[in-house]
Amino acid sequence: AYVVQVMNLALLEDFDHLYRYADLLELERGIHAERLVGCYTEIMPGRPTIAEHRHPRDSVRKPISAATAAPITKLNAAIITAAEQQTMNYYMNIGTFYDSDLGRRLYQEIGMIEEQHVTQYSALLDPGMTWLENLLLHEYTECYLYWSCVEDETDLHIKKIWEQHFEQECSHLHAAEALLKQYEGKEACQIIPDGTFPELLRFGPQKEYLRKVLKTTILNTAVQDAPAIPVETL
């Protein structure tokens, strides 16, 4: 429940970012973003950007325990941390080259929020894991993502590409397993106890879930000891 609260908080903030970039896209290019997201997601206001800025300490979350957390929880934390890191890097480094001042300012503003998100999600990761344990989990995460793409892909040509990448990541996973055993005397099953992937990722509509989160948490914010509290209680 704690991790879900953490993710739902930033979900509404990224929902706001989607809305603002969609507005910019239509304003400057005349392109309707609904076509690009396949109508899986509604493009509408989320938590306003101006309400997303917080004190740095209020973005630090409690870490999960790699020893007791469910495999899907560890995967979710690893996936969202990597995704937010890439997003932040893109906004902060590439956004400055956007061809309009309006767009550059939007990238800069939202890039600051993405930096908060990177702090929030990376704080969920277990700081007690060793470098090689993290390497194993990293490779396992990539295998999980590629296999999800394989199973969900409908274009046979693209499916073969996902399969090729999955096989490559499996070899990386075996290499990480060997390093863990050689240098730390640990078995992979100590980090990944189940050889079967958790429920795979699927691309599909999530409108109802987003509406529910919007309805129940739109006025929430975060403080150091709580990932989601009503603003009115501050």
What does each of the following model-derived ranges do?
Residues 1-234:
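Non-heme di-metal
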